[in-house]
Regions:
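The conserved Walker
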Residues: 59
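Small-molecule kinase domains that catalyze NTP-dependent phosphoryl transfer to phosphate-bearing small molecules
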Residues: 155-158, 163-211, 218-228
Length: 228
């Protein structure tokens, strides 16, 4: 998983003054313009469906590592895919957000909307975010049709995640140096019924990738290798 300044931003070591005030008034007089190229047409051309793969779990559970490995496997098969990473989006799209509950909610709201655009563009989009709250994940799921959102719980015990933390972020959180750190000073709500539970704390990366790829094939999102 990423460490250093980017990882600290993902998990709460963030300037508490970040986040400028925004207007709460919604835009008016806007109309949705439908594309002349449909999602179905893109799927037909590319030979695979689009989907949102939502990787969630504690910091250090292996979300980004697994998402990027699955992304590579999809790419090697010639499939359209892209990773939205929790650290990366805070460099741009969400660099005005901190780690309060409200900011976390807004962070996931934005990612859900971006993922929906990728879905319409015919891409298998892999999102790797702690996304600690069930309600926020449920809102992201509700943006799309049933079957388009695949929640993948990267399950790893807290002690395993701490052992993987070479930069000592968990230790700093326990010492009170990092505020709102998920799993220590901020809660993580495990998925109650994820489409897929991957034991990233126990099995190898290769096994985890194989589990995800097999699930996508079973659901008819991607073709078996050699049939694309």
């Amino acid at each position: 998983m990423p460490n250093g300044p980017a990882a600290e931003r993902e998990n709460g070591a963030h300037d508490p003054t970040a986040g400028a005030a925004m207007s709460t008034a919604p835009a008016t007089n806007i109309v949705w313009h439908h594309s002349t190229v449909t999602r179905a047409a893109r799927a037909h051309q590319r030979g695979h469906r689009s989907a949102i793969l939502w990787f969630t779990g504690l910091s250090g559970a292996g979300k980004s590592t697994l998402a990027n490995a699955v992304n590579s496997a999809l790419f090697e098969q010639g499939l359209a895919c892209y990773v939205l990473d929790g650290d990366n989006v805070r460099h741009g799209l969400c660099n005005d957000l901190g780690f309060s509950d409200a900011d976390r909610e807004e962070n996931i709201r934005r990612i859900g909307e971006v993922a929906k655009l990728f879905l319409d563009a015919g891409v298998v989009v892999l999102t790797a975010f702690v996304s600690p709250f069930r309600a926020d994940r449920a809102r992201a799921r509700a943006l799309v049709e049933t079957g388009d959102f695949i929640e993948i719980f990267c399950a790893a015990d807290l002690d395993v995640c701490e052992q993987r933390d070479t930069k000592g972020l968990y230790a700093r959180a326990r010492a009170g140096e990092i505020r709102d750190f998920t799993g220590i000073s901020s809660p993580y709500e495990e998925p109650e019924a994820p489409e897929l539970r991957v034991e990233t704390g126990r099995q190898s990366l290769e096994e985890s990738v194989g589990q995800v790829m097999a699930h996508l094939e079973t659901r008819g999102i991607i073709p078996p290798p050699g049939e694309g």
